[in-house]
């Protein structure tokens, strides 16, 4: 049976393609007829304009198909673990037990909520960074009567709102209760994230303690960075600081880190341009040169926390914690990708061999951290890049290199289509040269859009939360 016969949009797409093709051929015929008496310059200009019109129509069609195509799949047709497209799969959630914390680490480690950054008072410059939460699905006890319990960091508000939605789904008629958020009265220990608006103490509106284990699990699923079922009376949750969010959300390198160009020259990432061909890595660990097609993030002024991986061959990779790094599994002889802040000493990463130019495993001998200025996240067509001789992914946040690479497929397709278009310089007498200073500053719109939807389509176990 023909697949297009059972999928209405496929037939429509076929008709559209034929229509576009007919229009292009029709316009080509008209152009050919009128170009008999036209000068060579006029004919060239008409040809360029005609090509651009056809490719513009093709680009619109491809964009439409990219939007409609995923909607035609059901969960039964999706591959791999996790949630499929369409309705979410039902997953078994297990409640936390009393005294359990997730992750099972100190709250102030980088893999949890991160270090303290200082108490925020009403007269502190950072007080303006706290935001009120007026979600009607959340009850705030507000014992002080000052509205302080509604104030929190942006990340804390985001996760709390997600949790409130989960609570209503889990227990219809029950709402999330916040008993403490930002604290200005020093009711907690000397080292508490309540003073920074990064922690909340929560319960359910019916105060049913039998629900608290599952409430803690829902908080983990909502993306809180540290959850503790420390007391029978409430659940404690905290998040990373907003200032470290971009390092956590978008994987980046330092601008001073270098990439190897195809001509053999090493170039700082802060000076890379779209179109540069840099050393990358194939899916099976082979060295290959790949084109830079965009920057997912680029900000040369932003201060950021980085993880530093030192190898026994004296290579040093400086990268944000949520970035994926290639790790060689010697026992299984397989290449995997691991979040940078979860790489451990004695793990092996792939490093370029100076003599052969091939990528070889080197042992990590030290894992450190550093705070530095500037972030750069180039995306190559291959989805990988060798930085400071160490092979790394171009992706972050999601612990699947293949899924992340699939998610950026529209950008690779768009880059290919743009390459087919006649150069704009053909329409102008003097081409414009784009300097480094004129390049993108900030997060790419498509990467930012993917980040915003990830919490709604991916399980927490797939995310660096």
Curated annotation (Swiss-Prot):
Residues engaged in binding Ca(2+) 1: 143-144, 149, 179-180
EC class (word): hydrolase
UniProt-listed CDD domains: Hint
Entry-linked Pfam families: HH_signal (PF01085), Hint (PF01079)
Site (Involved in cholesterol transfer): 297
Residues annotated for Ca(2+) 2 binding in this entry: 144, 180, 183, 185
Covalently lipidated residues, kind Cholesterol glycine ester: 251
Biological process per Gene Ontology, one example term: imaginal disc-derived wing morphogenesis
EC nos: 3.1.-.-
Lipid attachment in record (N-palmitoyl cysteine): 79
Site description Cleavage, residues in chain: 251-252
Keywords: Autocatalytic cleavage, Calcium, Cell membrane, Cytoplasm, Developmental protein, Hydrolase, Lipoprotein, Membrane, Metal-binding, Morphogen, Nucleus, Palmitate, Protease, Segmentation polarity protein, Signal, Transferase
GO MF entries: calcium ion binding; cholesterol-protein transferase activity; morphogen activity; patched binding; peptidase activity
Domain of life, source organism: Eukaryota
InterPro entries for this protein: Hedgehog, Hedgehog_Hint, Hedgehog_sig/DD-Pept_Zn-bd_sf, Hedgehog_Signaling, Hedgehog_signalling_dom, Hint_dom_C, Hint_dom_N, Hint_dom_sf
Recorded coiled-coil stretches: none
Residues flagged as site, Involved in auto-cleavage: 320
Subcellular location: Nucleus; Cytoplasm
PANTHER family, A to Z: HEDGEHOG, PROTEIN HEDGEHOG
Family label: Belongs to the hedgehog family.
Subunit structure: Interacts with shf.
Protein name (record): Protein hedgehog
Organism of derivation: Drosophila erecta (Fruit fly)
Classification lineage: Eukaryota, Metazoa, Ecdysozoa, Arthropoda, Hexapoda
């Amino acid at each position: 049976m023909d697949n297009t016969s059972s999928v209405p949009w496929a037939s429509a797409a076929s008709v559209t393609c034929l229509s576009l093709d007919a229009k292009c051929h029709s316009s080509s015929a008209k152009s050919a007829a009128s170009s008999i008496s036209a000068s060579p310059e006029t004919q060239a200009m008409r040809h360029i304009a005609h090509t651009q019109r056809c490719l513009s129509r093709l680009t619109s069609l491809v964009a439409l198909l990219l939007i409609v195509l995923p909607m035609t799949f059901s969960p039964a047709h999706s591959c791999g673990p996790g949630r499929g497209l369409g309705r979410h799969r039902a997953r078994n959630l297990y409640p936390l037990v009393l005294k359990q914390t997730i992750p099972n680490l100190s709250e102030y480690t980088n893999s949890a909520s991160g270090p303290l950054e200082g108490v925020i008072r009403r007269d502190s410059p950072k007080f303006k960074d706290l935001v009120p939460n007026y979600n009607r699905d959340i009850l705030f006890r507000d014992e002080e009567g000052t509205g302080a319990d509604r104030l929190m960091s942006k990340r804390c508000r985001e996760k709390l709102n997600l949790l409130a939605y989960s609570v209503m789904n889990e227990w219809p008629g029950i709402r999330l209760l916040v008993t403490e958020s930002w604290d200005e009265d020093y009711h907690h220990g000397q080292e508490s994230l309540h003073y920074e608006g990064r922690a909340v103490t929560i319960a359910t509106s019916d105060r049913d303690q039998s629900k608290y284990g599952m409430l803690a699990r829902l908080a983990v699923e909502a993306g809180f960075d540290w959850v503790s079922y420390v007391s029978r009376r409430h659940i404690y949750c905290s998040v990373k600081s907003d200032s470290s969010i971009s390092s956590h959300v978008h994987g980046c390198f330092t601008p001073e880190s270098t990439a190897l160009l195809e001509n053999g020259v090493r170039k700082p990432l802060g000076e890379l341009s779209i179109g540069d061909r840099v050393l990358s890595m194939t899916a099976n660990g082979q060295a290959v040169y790949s084109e830079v097609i965009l920057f997912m993030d680029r900000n040369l002024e932003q201060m950021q926390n980085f993880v530093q991986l030192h190898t026994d061959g004296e290579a040093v990779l400086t990268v944000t914690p949520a970035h994926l790094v290639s790790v060689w599994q010697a026992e299984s002889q397989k290449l995997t990708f691991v979040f940078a802040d979860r790489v451990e000493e004695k793990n092996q990463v792939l490093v370029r061999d100076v003599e052969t130019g091939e990528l070889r495993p080197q042992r990590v001998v030290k894992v450190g951290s550093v705070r530095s200025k500037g972030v750069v996240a180039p995306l190559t067509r291959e989805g990988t890049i060798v930085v400071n001789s160490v092979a790394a992914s171009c992706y972050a946040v999601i612990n699947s290199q293949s899924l992340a690479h699939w998610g950026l497929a529209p950008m690779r397709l768009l880059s290919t289509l743009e390459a087919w278009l006649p150069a704009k310089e053909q329409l102008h007498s003097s081409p414009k040269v784009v300097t480094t200073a004129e390049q993108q500053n900030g997060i790419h719109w498509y990467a930012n859009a993917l980040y915003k939807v990830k919490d709604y389509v991916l399980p927490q176990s797939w995310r660096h939360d």
